[in-house]
Amino acid sequence: ELGPHGDTKPEQITADGVVICAGVGSRALAAMLGDRINIYPVKGYSITVNLDDDASQQAAPWVSLMDDPVKIVSSRLAPDRLRVAGTAEFNGYNYDIRADRIEPLVTWVRREMPRVNTSAAVPWAGLRPMLPDLMPKVGAGKRSGVFYNTGHGHLGWTLAAATAETITAIITARLPV
């Protein structure tokens, strides 16, 4: 049974295998299983611009954009929503949203898309599970039946399907079906 702070009724579950894919929580789970995975939370910021008027909806691009020099990306989520993301911050497990990290995102939209109204922008911050070499941990752990698919960092959505296929192939090769 899960509550707002995790398990409220611990129970033992028997399984042939387990895949640890718990984002920044993977480090602690790996340690409990005898593995060391050097995942560190890297906070990423974004804004969702609610495109509440016709001019904003027409001005916002439908294709994803990447402004490499300033490390900002944008993606149209729906006819009335635009996501703009960028910046990275090493600050432990802190989820606080800093205005000085959001301001460059809003400023970028105003500069690059001057007809988009940013007054309804909603800020967000999340912790990206990063490894020092920026490569996800995809493979078996020390214990039999323990596998990892974690540490995708800022490329989580980009790599998720490919690493899921990879870990599936590894598991099916090692565990009886």
What are the residue ranges of the model-derived segments?
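Short beta-strand segments that buttress and anchor functional surface loops
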Residues: 1-4, 151
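A structured beta-alpha segment of the ubiquitous adenosine-cofactor-binding alpha/beta core
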Residues: 3-11
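Short, ordered coil/turn segments that flank beta-strands lining enzyme active or ligand-binding pockets
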Residues: 5-6, 78, 162
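Active-site substrate-recognition segment that forms the wall
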Residues: 10-13, 17-142
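C-terminal lid/capping helical subdomain adjacent to the catalytic/cofactor pocket in oxidative enzymes
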Residues: 51, 137-177
